């Protein structure tokens, strides 16, 4: 992590100290015209500042945001890294098959298959599968879920193996709710935090929760720009 604009600041909440990336510090240290950016653009910029490594994210990538207010565009690819990935079963199961195939290929070359894992945390919500065979009684819900497990036992055994085998991968079982509901009520964190080792120091990072979904309308919770300004102060 380069932190070319010296943006790292700390915030103490209770007994924990969190490190975040301050826009005020970035402006003070040469990154101009960013305090009035739209909040969605601020989220992208914070992502680049936090992940600056000189290779996938360079100082020039970050500086390009200086001109966004004037041009309303950025003239380069943005290497955005979401905090997490949300999948439903139609697209998620093939992805787990791909990961398993990659592990098999590495194993055949005498490599370590355990090195193949999602880089970002992934939640796979099984919400497209349950059929309605029983209805009109208090036991209908349980009966339909039980039938789903019987019909697709191989799929669920495979996904259980995936959850146990891969890092950064969780499965939400059928009958829990649709992925958007589960995301909003259980998975979304608004502010994401993680422990990360940076220059031999263990830091608790805090940053906006962002999600990439394998669905046309995956929803995400965000804290408001007012709240962001308060934290930045």
Language-model features, listed with the residues they occupy:
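Generic N-terminal initiation segments characterized by hydrophobic and/or small/turn-forming residues
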Residues: 28, 34-36, 41-42, 77, ...
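Acidic, Ala/Val/Gly-enriched low-complexity intrinsically disordered segments
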Residues: 231-232
């Amino acid at each position: 992590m380069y932190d070319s604009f010296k943006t790292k600041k700390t915030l103490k909440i209770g007994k924990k100290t969190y490190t975040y990336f301050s826009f005020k510090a970035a402006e003070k240290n040469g990154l101009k015209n960013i305090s009035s950016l739209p909040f969605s653009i601020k989220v992208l910029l914070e992502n680049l500042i936090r992940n600056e490594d000189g290779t996938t994210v360079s100082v020039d990538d970050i500086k390009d945001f200086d001109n966004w207010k004037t041009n309303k565009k950025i003239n380069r690819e943005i290497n955005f890294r979401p905090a997490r990935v949300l999948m439903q079963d139609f697209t998620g199961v093939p992805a787990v098959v791909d990961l398993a195939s990659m592990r098999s290929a590495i194993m055949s070359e005498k490599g370590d298959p355990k090195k193949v894992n999602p880089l970002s945390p992934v939640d796979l919500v099984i919400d497209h599968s349950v059929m309605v065979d029983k209805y009109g009684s208090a036991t209908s819900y349980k009966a339909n879920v039980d039938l789903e497990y019987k019909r697709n036992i191989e799929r669920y055994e495979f996904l259980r193996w995936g959850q146990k085998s891969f890092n950064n991968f969780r499965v939400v079982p059928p009958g829990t709710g649709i992925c958007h509901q589960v995301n909003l009520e259980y998975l979304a964190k608004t502010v994401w935090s993680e422990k990360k080792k940076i220059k031999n120091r263990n830091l608790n990072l805090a940053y906006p929760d962002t999600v990439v979904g394998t669905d046309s309308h995956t929803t995400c919770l965000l804290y408001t720009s007012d709240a962001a300004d308060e934290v930045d102060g």
